[in-house]
Amino acid sequence: MNSLLLSLMLLTLGLVPALGRPALQSADGPIVLPPELARVLTDYEACWKAGDAAALARLFTDDGFVLPPGQPLVRGRAAIQKLYTGPGSPLSLRAFAYAMHGNVGYIIGGFSPERGTPDEGKFTLTLRKDKHGRWLIVSDMDNFNRRRP
């Protein structure tokens, strides 16, 4: 197993203390992300709201994954763009925990249609920093708090 995949697995499992940097968490609600990770969420929100599937797909690595609830996994920017093609809709993302170690990291959070409304679901974003220092999404997995009809 290559070291990047192993690092991503450890981060996703919350074993970041073993890698030398603990996840930051808050029992009282959302946390403030470092600007470079906050950009990932604000860009995601903007692309989603605008219905810009091409821009949304560019937030992912070339071989990125989306693991949508109740559907097969989607891999690669072209497939991600196809998955997200459609009209925009309101989206607000907030972070509950994050970690960064070298060029890998994650964000765990919740989502709702509007800021300040109760979360409708939760998400995890696994991230990798590219050669230009920009954080890109390797995998995006979400689930809803209730089953959707």
Residue ranges and their predicted role:
Residues R21, E120-R148:
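Short beta-strand edge/turn micro-motifs at domain boundaries
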Residues Y44, L56-A57, G64, G76, ...:
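Hydrophobic pocket/interface hotspot
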Residues A53, Q71-V74, S112-E114, D142-R146:
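Solvent-exposed loop/turn segments at secondary-structure junctions
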Residues L59, D63-V74, G86-P87:
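A short gly/proline-enriched turn/hairpin at secondary-structure junctions
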